[in-house]
Amino acid sequence: MGRRIQGQRRGRGGPTFRAPSHRYKAELSHKKLEDVDTITGEIVGIEHDPARSAPLAEIEFEDDDRRLVLAPEGVRVGDTIQVGVSAEIKPGNTLPLAEIPEGVPVCNVESNRGDGGKFARASGVSATLLTHDRDVAVVQLPSGEVKRLDPQCRATIGVVAGGGRTEKPFVKAGNKYHKMKARGTKYPRVRGVAMNAVDHPFGGGGRQHPGQPKSVSRDAPPGRKVGDIASKRTGRGSNK
């Protein structure tokens, strides 16, 4: 009988495959306002978070609340930022989509009012506010998808800092290893056809080939569920 394949071991949830979330610094969300329309804070530090590729700005607000937020391009320690409906339109400030002029790049956009921000949070990306009225705000995401959102959903003005990160090569396998380890991903990943028959359904043989159809049912047992899972079509003519 063969050994458990890597997909089965990952499903068990051991420390090798589990994300080290105890090292993550914060779950980013917009500051909630209860008694005031707008509040002011000062950037007191810029930090790195292993959970994400973008730098974080530590903000100290007037009410002595400290929190980490995504740092847009152009902000620095000592800058003043505002959160609220009457905030100035400048990078780092957070306000509802209804109060932001059309065409302004925004980041950390809420999907539903009060959820803290879900869209455009990776380094170097931004969404664009296309238009808004009393009932709906239309936002184009970095992928090109257009979303219709509640105009009271909040967003931060600017482009997320850290752009150009993907243009720098890893150079060494060790750098890639540490990057993947910070996110709880096993690296390097060995191809199934390069394994022995005991280790993978595609392993073994005198040459590297699957030796069986790669398409597999969605209901296949865990030890067989490898390859093209529940594929609608395969091959070079898949766009037809």
Curated annotation (Swiss-Prot):
The keyword RNA-binding applies. The keyword Metal-binding does not apply. GO terms for molecular function: rRNA binding; structural constituent of ribosome. Keywords: Ribonucleoprotein, Ribosomal protein, RNA-binding, rRNA-binding. Residues 1-12 have a biased composition (Basic residues). InterPro entries: NA-bd_OB-fold, Rib_uL2_dom2, Ribosomal_uL2, Ribosomal_uL2_arc_euk, Ribosomal_uL2_C, Ribosomal_uL2_CS, Ribosomal_uL2_dom3, Ribosomal_uL2_RNA-bd_dom. Residues 1-21, 198-240 are annotated as: Disordered. SMART domains: Ribosomal_L2, Ribosomal_L2_C. SUPFAM superfamilies: Nucleic acid-binding proteins, Translation proteins SH3-like domain. Gene3D superfamilies: 2.30.30.30, Nucleic acid-binding proteins, Ribosomal protein L2, domain 3. One of its GO terms (biological process) is cytoplasmic translation. One of its GO terms (cellular component) is cytosolic large ribosomal subunit. Belongs to the universal ribosomal protein uL2 family. Part of the 50S ribosomal subunit. Forms a bridge to the 30S subunit in the 70S ribosome. One of the primary rRNA binding proteins. Required for association of the 30S and 50S subunits to form the 70S ribosome, for tRNA binding and peptide bond formation. It has been suggested to have peptidyltransferase activity; this is somewhat controversial. Makes several contacts with the 16S rRNA in the 70S ribosome. This is Large ribosomal subunit protein uL2. The lineage of its organism: Archaea, Methanobacteriati, Methanobacteriota, Stenosarchaea group, Halobacteria. The gene is rpl2.
